[in-house]
């Protein structure tokens, strides 16, 4: 799956091949997991997936921004933002390192 955008359908297909559930069950499983993550984040909870990372909802306060074209100040209202913080394991995997901080010889 490298080099492209992975969709829900791609995740469902991967579950189908690797776990052995039917395509319908695989799609339902992926949908349920994503729905649960969304529900938790919408209620302000942190979602932590071991060896993957954490999804955290943070509050941003009111501030003054500026229109880059006109220079006019614009009030930016307080809001909630979602932040993803990858685990060290995921960072190492992305950078081609194994758990000991050494490059894999693939």
UniProtKB/Swiss-Prot annotation:
Entry GO CC: cytosol
InterPro entries documented for this protein: Hist_DNA-bd, Histone-like_DNA-bd_CS, IHF-like_DNA-bd_dom_sf, IHF_alpha
Annotated GO biological process: DNA recombination; positive regulation of metabolic process; regulation of DNA-templated transcription; regulation of translation
Molecular-function GO terms, alphabetical: DNA binding; structural constituent of chromatin
Top-level taxon of the source organism: Bacteria
The keyword Protein biosynthesis belongs to this UniProt entry's keyword annotation: no
SUPFAM superfamilies: IHF-like DNA-binding proteins
Keywords attached to this entry: DNA recombination, DNA-binding, Transcription, Transcription regulation, Translation regulation
Family: Belongs to the bacterial histone-like protein family.
Described function: This protein is one of the two subunits of integration host factor, a specific DNA-binding protein that functions in genetic recombination as well as in transcriptional and translational control.
Self-association state and partner proteins as the record states: Heterodimer of an alpha and a beta chain.
Protein name: Integration host factor subunit alpha
Gene, per the UniProt record: ihfA
């Amino acid at each position: 799956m490298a080099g492209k955008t992975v969709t829900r359908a791609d995740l469902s297909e991967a579950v189908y091949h690797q776990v052995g559930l039917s395509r319908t069950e695989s799609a339902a499983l992926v949908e349920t997991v994503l729905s649960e993550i969304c529900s938790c984040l919408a209620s302000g909870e942190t979602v932590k997936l071991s060896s993957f990372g954490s999804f955290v909802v943070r509050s941003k306060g009111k501030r003054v921004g500026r229109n880059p074209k006109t220079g006019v100040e614009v009030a930016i209202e307080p809001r909630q933002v979602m932040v993803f913080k990858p685990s060290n394991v995921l960072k190492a995997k992305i950078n081609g390192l194994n758990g000991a901080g050494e490059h894999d010889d693939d």
